[in-house]
A protein has these predicted regions:
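N-terminal intrinsically disordered/low-complexity leader segments
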Residues: 1-33, 44, 103
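Amphipathic alpha-helical packing segments from all-alpha helical-bundle domains
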Residues: 139-165, 170-177, 200-211
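Short secondary-structure transition hinges
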Residues: 119-157, 165, 188, 192
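Amphipathic alpha-helical linker/stalk segments
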Residues: 26, 86-110, 142-150
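Hydrophobic alpha-helical connector segments
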Residues: 83, 97-127, 152, 176-179
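Generic hydrophobic, amphipathic alpha-helix propensity
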Residues: 34-42, 59, 84-88, 92, ...
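Helix-turn-helix
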Residues: 37, 45-79, 83
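Amphipathic C-terminal alpha-helical segment
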Residues: 161, 180-197, 211-212
Length: 212
């Protein structure tokens, strides 16, 4: 069953943003907050349909405004999808952070964070695909802390907690890339029907990345 999506959003998209929980079927629009309401409605719409079937006019209808009003904030559909993708990436990081903190020790936290990544993809497939299909000026993993979404910050933090203290930045980057490739590839295999949504199998695969 698809979980209700709590997402993190404001114009700056930093890790200090508040999590906003909005019912997926009826996001509410409050005067003066049209941009955030549009992102919420867009997230809800992606729970029901693919990115290809996403329509800006449907978002406007759901929040009770004209398409013209939305165009004042988003010049086209791609601009709105970009804002939704940014919110999704930060929310993914928040899910991973929560999983890591609940786990305790660094190695267990790494595994649980990876499981949370794959689980997010399975629970929100259209959003997950959008997040990583949206064009970016630079690779997400290379983005400065706080600008590429807290998902990448969380990944780098988890890697730093269990690699050797004297590891070079390049070594840590290679470890982070390897971990990301594993969980992202696993998520895509499940979404594309190439491997079953088997929680035990997913956990075993991710544990293989843990040293020792």
């Amino acid at each position: 069953m698809v979980q209700q999506l709590g997402y993190v959003y404001n114009d700056n998209m930093t890790s200090n943003d508040n999590i906003v929980n909005i019912a997926l079927d009826r996001p509410r629009y409050h005067h003066g907050d049209l941009r955030a309401a549009a992102v919420a409605a867009g997230l809800a719409l992606l729970e029901e349909r693919s990115v290809d079937d996403f329509a800006l006019r449907e978002v406007a209808r759901r929040i009770g405004v004209s398409a013209t009003a939305l165009y004042r904030h988003f010049p086209d559909k791609q601009a709105l999808l970009g804002a939704i993708a940014a919110a999704g990436l930060v929310t993914l990081g928040e899910r991973q952070r929560q999983a890591s903190e609940a786990a305790g020790d660094p190695l267990h936290a790494f595994v649980e964070s990876g499981i949370a990544y794959v689980r997010f993809a399975i629970d929100h497939p259209s959003l997950f695909r959008l997040v990583f299909a949206t064009a970016s000026a630079e690779p997400i993993l290379d983005s400065p802390r706080g600008t590429g979404g807290s998902a990448m910050d969380q990944l780098r933090d988890n890697i730093a907690r269990f690699v050797a203290d004297d590891s070079s930045n390049e070594a840590q980057k290679a470890a982070a890339l390897g971990a990301w490739a594993l969980v992202h590839g696993l998520a895509m295999l499940v979404l594309d029907g190439q491997t079953p949504d088997d929680p035990e199998l997913i956990a075993r695969v991710i544990r293989q990345m843990v040293p020792g």
